[in-house]
Amino acid sequence: MPTLSMFYGIIVYMYNEKGGKHNTPHIHAEYSGEEIVLSLNGEVLEPNSKFPKNKLKMLEVWTDIHKEELQANWQLLSRGEKYFRIDPLK
């Protein structure tokens, strides 16, 4: 699974969707073994009550800042092409 970015202990990744069944562009994130799925519009698609709220807020801010880059990566991965890394939250 391609890792797009890492910041403050959060690992953000996106699956290769070539021929996949997912319709909603989204990212996966992991922090201390807890995972969450977030649409590129900021909606939590697979809630995880153990994912820290402060880390979720950071993830939401990062997603908003990098929405265009995330959408471009979604398109690239959907076509089976190489993705690019995205700057971390600073």
Model-predicted segments: where are they?
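Short, charged low-complexity linear motifs
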Residues: I10-V12, S49, L59-E60
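Short, charged/polar N-terminal "headpieces" of proteins
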Residues: M1-N23
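Intrinsically disordered, low-complexity boundary segments flanking structured domains
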Residues: M1-P2, P25-I27, A72-N73
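Generic structural "secondary-structure junction" signal
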Residues: M6, L40, P47, K53, ...
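A short, structured beta-strand/loop element
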Residues: G19-N54
